[in-house]
């Protein structure tokens, strides 16, 4: 098949598969069953075998809409450009179908046939940047007027460098955990005095929290070297599948070395933190990083003290390179999902990314400063680990 015939066959096959499985999802009395999704996954596998170059069925297997994402009735081929053994097709999707209005398909010539290599949806022009240059410059101007750091919060990892150099560390316990379980550990002793006295209560509460940390799970610490990437005066941090923020603090341009902090808690292996080392000097103090938040098209920017990591992933990257990526390059980066990897949109590494921490929601970012208050490290903490600890054997044997 030529590229156009392959795409037309894919659209027809996808719509037919959707129509065949749809009755399984329409049985509202019994609700959607696992069998319905199993059948849908099997159909998507068949579509992969028939039309695509590799296994991509998982891209659409976790959802099922009332109308197909791809159909000759709702998707129109606008143009196809052939470059030797590769072809790029642009398709338009009307509003009746789920997904972005712009679709790009990359096809590859395999033997005597053309196969679909990738499919990407876009809400904006694929060649447009994630953030327009004038908007990014407005963010930088706002950052320059913002206090870029503040004292560490009480829930912050006290010394990230110590945890990165440890063999074992105890898990972090958030404030919600304290409030739920504090009543079980808030032991009043005769010598404590009046429990209605605020200072007495604060002291007993601090003792109870310390006891909870002593009993917290201890996990092994492993460092994974990710690699190096060049950076300019500003770094970006956050969630590559959610909100990436501009760090307010300016840094000396250079080459950063990235590391992932891995651990195992509750039997689950995860990324606890991501660190970039900006200079060989050791940090002697840590401060909470302030980031600038705004929508991609807005110059109305505000400062904030937390980083939204809703997908559980974390990234630290050169701000100009990251926000300057086109939507097409961003889609390419989105397919590079590994435990820890250098983010490369095709022009070389621009940052480091990890997948994923267990804490879905909020991460903390810290600057490590040298004796002259110059930034030498930036850590994105998923709030998994708190501080170095003795190995479990030593704890239980004491």
Per-region residue spans from a language model:
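Low-complexity, intrinsically disordered terminal/linker segments enriched in charged
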Residues: 3, 7, 11, 79-86, ...
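Core segments of small alpha/beta cavity-forming domains
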Residues: 1-62
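Short, exposed beta-strand/loop patches in secreted or surface proteins that constitute
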Residues: 76-82, 107, 342, 367-368
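Short, compact, well-ordered microdomains
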Residues: 95, 99-121, 360-385
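Surface-exposed, charged secondary-structure patches
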Residues: 35-98
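A broad structural signal for short, well-ordered beta-strand segments within beta-sheet-rich domains
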Residues: 72, 77, 116, 271, ...
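Short aromatic-glycine motifs in intrinsically disordered, low-complexity regions
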Residues: 62-66, 103, 107-110, 352-357
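N-terminal domain-onset segments
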Residues: 143-398
